[in-house]
Amino acid sequence: FAVLVLFSTVVQAQSLDKLFRKYADDERFEYTSIGKGMLGFASIFADYSILTEGQMEKITGFKMLKLEKDSAYQELAEKFMNDIDAIIEKGDFETSLVKREKDRRIYVYKRVDKRANADMLLLSKSNTGINFVWLKGKTSDEEMDRIQFEKERQAKEEDIL
């Protein structure tokens, strides 16, 4: 069973990697990737648990894709959103935040495996473009306990129904 859980976590992370590789070299996208070394250096100046509101204690990877909306890119924007939606749906992500403004939508999704490895996705859609950010790292012990408690509570509710 543990091997199956580990395998599914690896496959899900590969799906995110595959999505970023797919669009990273496309000239119509702005792509940013910050590796573990640079993030380690940045941690000297910033507390990641504060920046992520306690959800991530350590960030080991940061990737961002940005697509400016243009009528010529409408089909590409739809395909990009379909790819993102598929990853979120298949990846067992929990919705942490949904914010709707007049001309913009912001979504934050997260998932944590049994070893406290965490992925946080930030998606911003507006009339002018799409921004998709992937933060990879470790969650805090407190957040891990909260997630475990929430999963147990949901399982009990499902048993009652």
Placement of each model-derived feature along the sequence:
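Localized chelating/binding microdomains
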Residues: S43-F45, T60-K69, N117-A118, F132-V133, ...
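Contiguous interface-forming segments/domains that mediate binding rather than catalysis
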Residues: R21, I88-D92, R146-E152
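A short, solvent-exposed beta-edge/loop patch
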Residues: Y109-S140
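Extracytoplasmic
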Residues: D26-F29, E57-F62, K90, E101-D103, ...
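Mid-length scaffold segments of soluble, non-membrane domains
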Residues: L65-R104
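C-terminal partner/receptor-binding element of secreted or periplasmic proteins
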Residues: Q12, G137-L161
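Early exported N-terminus immediately downstream of N-terminal targeting peptides
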Residues: L16-M81
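Bacterial Sec-dependent N-terminal signal peptides
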Residues: F1-L19
